[in-house]
């Protein structure tokens, strides 16, 4: 009951603050060398970064330097975002800051990004800098803070207007059973608090993903569309299609079965056959001969070269990958064809891989293996 009361308290705080109150509440850094405007922009950038919106964060840091070219916090923030020392520019950017003289908050940040263990270093800084939320937030992941769950609960209570990232972390913990029992109700409570506090792209992206975890694909599509609206299709667009396909998984399964039936029907109209083939499909036999890359026209010419008496696909089983971009179908094709004036009983085990798009399904590759009868004609 005590823990649930803490959740309800956080939910109430999120409802009371709202997104418009963030700038007026706690600052990530208590003092910077930047002008007031540049400081505010850096603060928004840190909020974006801690909410996994790195492109938006980088734009904020760059904007702060346009306003104030001497804003050390923005320079440190850009260095902190850079890639690692092996191939990126992080080392050179940090080296360029070696002789800077900033505020205690800025110098502490520089020390953190130079350390070998950021969370532990941040936790240590937080003990000496109680008003600098940045170090308290990063320190939430330190083993010195106890469990990450406890660390983020404590941060959300201490810095409620900056708690978006922590609320997000807590929502995922309950959605995925990370250190706690899976609990959809609690996960959604944290999500709603997160959304009230930070109505931006990542909040909707998280709401979509967690909705999908619990099978609510329609809700996932709706929130992912909001994420695209706020953060652009480049980062968030792919998942809209994925959730839409998951919401229509049964229809896609039937589409694959129907496509298999078309290819197993020697009397299917050519336009129907061509519609389920890719521009080039890889066709393989289990006899270890090289596979053939065929256009739709080449495949149909080969299929039409056989005098089929009958053919059908049986026991079709369809499996999808997690992203719903590929399907694997396995089935047993049976029938008869004429060869040198003789009737041949046809029986093969077929496995095929299909591309799944919002427009439909198309064959990528297929393999035929004789199973209790003759395989494909030698032609």
Predicted regions and their residues:
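Alpha-helical segment of the N-proximal tetratricopeptide repeat
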Residues: 34-63, 67, 106-121, 131, ...
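Residue-level recognition of tetratricopeptide repeat
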Residues: 37, 71, 131-135, 162-163, ...
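Glycine-centered coil turns and helix-coil junctions that link the paired helices
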Residues: 44, 51, 78, 82-86, ...
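Canonical tetratricopeptide repeat
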Residues: 77, 138, 169, 206, ...
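Alpha-helical repeat scaffolds
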Residues: 88-101, 119-128, 147-159, 182-195, ...
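Short, low-complexity N-terminal intrinsically disordered segments enriched in polar/charged residues
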Residues: 230, 239-275, 279, 377-379
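A solvent-exposed, acidic/Ser-Thr-rich amphipathic alpha-helical stretch
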Residues: 269-325, 345
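Short beta-strand edge/turn micro-motifs at domain boundaries
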Residues: 347-378
């Amino acid at each position: 009951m005590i823990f649930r009361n803490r959740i309800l308290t956080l939910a109430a705080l999120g409802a009371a603050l709202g997104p418009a109150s963030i700038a007026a509440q706690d600052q990530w850094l208590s003092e910077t060398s930047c002008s007031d405007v540049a400081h505010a922009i850096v603060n928004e950038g840190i909020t974006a970064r801690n909410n996994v919106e790195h492109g938006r964060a980088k734009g904020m840091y760059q904007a702060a330097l346009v306003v104030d070219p001497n804003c050390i916090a923005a320079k440190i923030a850009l260095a902190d975002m850079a890639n690692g020392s092996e191939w990126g520019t992080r080392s050179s950017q940090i080296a360029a800051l070696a002789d800077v003289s900033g505020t205690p908050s800025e110098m502490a940040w520089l020390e953190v990004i130079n350390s070998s263990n950021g969370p532990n270093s941040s936790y240590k800084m937080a003990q000496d800098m109680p008003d600098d939320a940045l170090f308290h937030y990063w320190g939430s992941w330190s083993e010195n803070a106890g469990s990450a769950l406890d660390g983020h609960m404590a941060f959300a209570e201490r810095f409620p207007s900056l708690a978006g990232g922590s609320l997000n972390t807590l929502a995922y913990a309950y959605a995925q059973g990370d250190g706690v029992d899976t609990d959809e109700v609690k996960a959604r409570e944290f999500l709603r608090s997160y959304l009230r506090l930070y109505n931006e792209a990542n909040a909707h992206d998280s709401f979509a993903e967690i909705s999908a975890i619990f099978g609510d694909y329609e809700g996932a599509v709706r929130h992912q569309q909001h994420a695209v609206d706020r953060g652009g299709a480049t980062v968030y667009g792919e998942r809209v299609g994925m959730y839409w396909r998951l919401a229509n998984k049964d229809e896609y399964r039937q589409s694959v079965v129907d496509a298999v039936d078309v290819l197993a029907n020697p009397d299917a109209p050519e336009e129907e056959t061509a519609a389920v083939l890719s521009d080039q499909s890889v066709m393989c036999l289990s006899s270890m001969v090289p596979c053939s890359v065929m256009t739709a026209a080449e495949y149909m010419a080969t299929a039409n070269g056989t005098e089929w008496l009958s053919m059908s696909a049986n026991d079709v089983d369809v499996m999808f990958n997690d992203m719903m971009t590929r399907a694997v179908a396995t089935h047993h094709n049976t029938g008869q064809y004429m060869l040198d004036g003789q009737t041949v009983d046809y029986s093969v085990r077929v496995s095929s891989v299909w591309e799944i798009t919002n427009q439909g399904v198309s064959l990528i590759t297929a393999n035929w293996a004789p199973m209790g009868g003759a395989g494909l004609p030698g032609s």
